From Swiss-Prot:
Domain remark in the UniProt entry: Consists of two distinct domains, a catalytic core and a N-terminal extension that is involved in tRNA binding.
Matching InterPro entries: aa-tRNA-synt_IIb, aa-tRNA-synth_II, aa-tRNA-synth_II/BPL/LPL, Ser-tRNA-ligase_type_1, Ser-tRNA-synth_1_N, SerRS_1_N_sf, SerRS_core, tRNA-bd_arm
GO molecular-function terms, A-Z: ATP binding; serine-tRNA ligase activity
Binding positions for ATP per the UniProt entry: R266, S267, E268, E353, I354, S355, S356
Enzyme Commission designation: 6.1.1.11
Organism listed in the record: Actinobacillus succinogenes (strain ATCC 55618 / DSM 22257 / CCUG 43843 / 130Z)
Organism classification: Bacteria, Pseudomonadati, Pseudomonadota, Gammaproteobacteria, Pasteurellales
Protein task: Catalyzes the attachment of serine to tRNA(Ser). Is also able to aminoacylate tRNA(Sec) with serine, to form the misacylated tRNA L-seryl-tRNA(Sec), which will be further converted into selenocysteinyl-tRNA(Sec).
CDD domains: SerRS_core
Keywords of this entry: Aminoacyl-tRNA synthetase, ATP-binding, Cytoplasm, Ligase, Nucleotide-binding, Protein biosynthesis
GO cellular component terms, semicolon-separated: cytoplasm
Catalysed transformations (reactions): tRNA(Ser) + L-serine + ATP = L-seryl-tRNA(Ser) + AMP + diphosphate + H(+); tRNA(Sec) + L-serine + ATP = L-seryl-tRNA(Sec) + AMP + diphosphate + H(+)
Residues that coordinate or bind L-serine: T235, A236, E237, E289, S389
Identification of the protein by name: Serine--tRNA ligase
């Protein structure tokens, strides 16, 4: 969540920024009223507590002098009732303010271009030249089905729309991609590999910002009697980032760099009719996620590094891509700055998103109470959190199939993947 002090001390300015950069309308009148109530109740609570403490001390002194303390006891009891009522009201108002805070998006960094949607994103760079084919280009669905490696009918039979079954060499290529990405990030980029739960509790989802605002995007389990409800993770960002929830980290041990390969589960609410063919938009897909936990002043530098790590995957696979700086209207709820990497897909004759790398600033850390402290310093500070896809495995498979296709329908295996594929250079029927 954003810093509550922005609402307490700069309410009008913060509301204006949210309106201009996020098209988010803050109810200034309601917030001002609640904040005034909170302050008044805080003062009342502190005053009543002080008075009660004084009366309690007076009881002890009166007892020592042998005086009648009945009236003082009555006063303390009365003050206790008033104090409990004031505290209850204070908690109610604070909870109402917190509920509002949880719905407010992060404020974009100053360098983020203002815009309403993806049409106003800014291309930063391109790498690689799209291949020229001397035969009719097939899409990944046709390629995968022709070599008996992709079976969408089986996915529908087993689960429904937006599911697929991979078999044989295609399944192995998919696995090879994930292993290659993990090896690169752990052995060269310095990330710690983690294996995390695919089911998480609601506290975890609040921590990274999926709840309360985006509950419809998740697959929720039905809670068993006596157990808390769970949801399937929409990305490994959720459990991996929450590993530092309620922790005070030593500055000397930062940055923390973690990676995980997991399936991801998304309801794709609001995506009806979009990308209904193939692997581009699935309810279940694999992703290798990168997460960094850093000192506040180093997060923008870390974003460039993390994005570069995702870019290196594409370069080693020799897949043409472009790097895009998202405008304010296209960024995720909790991000303050985001780069998207878009890979070239020949069958669509366009670039499609394959990675999103974001600096979340202290937005998630405040929700999670993830802090850091320097050696010898008593004061703690909120860390900054970053995350990025390194990469979406299914979409990378799509890009490999389409960019490495041959006229006979076979697929040339990228050189860096051959050690994971029994050193074969081509897969086909």
């Amino acid at each position: 969540m954003i810093d509550p002090n922005l609402l307490r001390n700069n309410l009008e300015e913060t509301a204006q920024k949210l309106k201009e950069k996020r098209n988010f309308i803050l109810d200034v009148k309601q917030l001002r009223k609640l904040e005034e109530q909170r302050k008044a109740l805080q003062v009342k609570t502190e005053t009543l507590q002080a008075e009660r403490n004084l009366r309690s001390k007076a009881i002890g002194a009166a007892k020592a002098r042998g005086e009648n303390i009945e009236s003082l006891l009555n006063e303390v009891d009365h003050l206790g009732i008033e104090l409990a009522q004031a505290k209850a009201l204070f908690d109610d108002v604070s909870a109402e303010l917190n509920t509002i805070l949880l719905t407010i998006p992060n404020i974009p960094a100053d360098e983020v271009p203002q815009g309403k949607d993806d049409t106003e994103n800014q291309e930063v760079a391109r790498w690689g030249t799209p291949r020229t084919f001397d035969f009719e280009v097939k899409d990944h669905v046709t390629l995968g089905e022709n070599i008996d490696g992709l079976d969408f009918s089986a996915g529908v039979k087993l689960s429904g729309a937006r599911f697929a079954v991979m078999k044989g060499r295609i399944a192995k290529l998919h696995r090879a991609l994930a292993q290659f990405m993990l090896d690169l990030h752990t052995e060269k980029h310095g990330y710690l590999e983690t294996y995390v739960p695919y089911l998480v509790n609601h506290t975890t989802l609040y921590g990274t910002g999926q709840l309360p605002k985006f509950g419809e995007d998740l697959f929720h389990t039905k809670a068993l009697e006596g157990e808390q409800p769970y949801a399937l993770i929409p990305t490994a960002e959720v459990p991996v980032t929450n590993l530092v929830r309620d922790e005070i980290l030593s500055v000397e041990n930062l940055p923390l760099k973690m990676t995980a390969h997991t399936p991801c589960f998304r309801s794709e609410a609001g995506s009806y009719g979009r990308d209904t063919r193939g692997l581009i938009r699935m309810h279940q897909f694999d992703k290798v996620e990168m997460v960094q936990i850093v000192e506040p002043e180093k997060s923008m530098e870390a974003l460039e590094e993390l994005t570069g790590h995702a870019e290196e995957v594409l370069r080693l696979l020799n897949l043409p891509y472009r790097k895009v700086l998202l405008c304010s209207g296209d960024m995720g709820f909790g991000a303050c700055k985001t780069y998207d990497l878009e890979v070239w897909l020949p069958a669509q004759n366009t670039y499609r998103e394959i990675s999103s790398c974001s600096n979340m600033w202290d937005f998630q850390a405040r929700r999670m109470q993830a802090r850091c402290r320097a050696k010898g310093d008593k004061k703690t500070r909120l860390v900054h959190t970053l995350n990025g896809s390194g990469l979406a495995v299914g979409r990378t498979l799509v890009a490999v199939l389409e960019n490495y296709q041959n006229a006979d329908g076979s697929i040339t295996v990228p050189e860096v993947l051959r050690p994971y594929m029994d050193n074969v250079d081509t897969i086909g029927r």
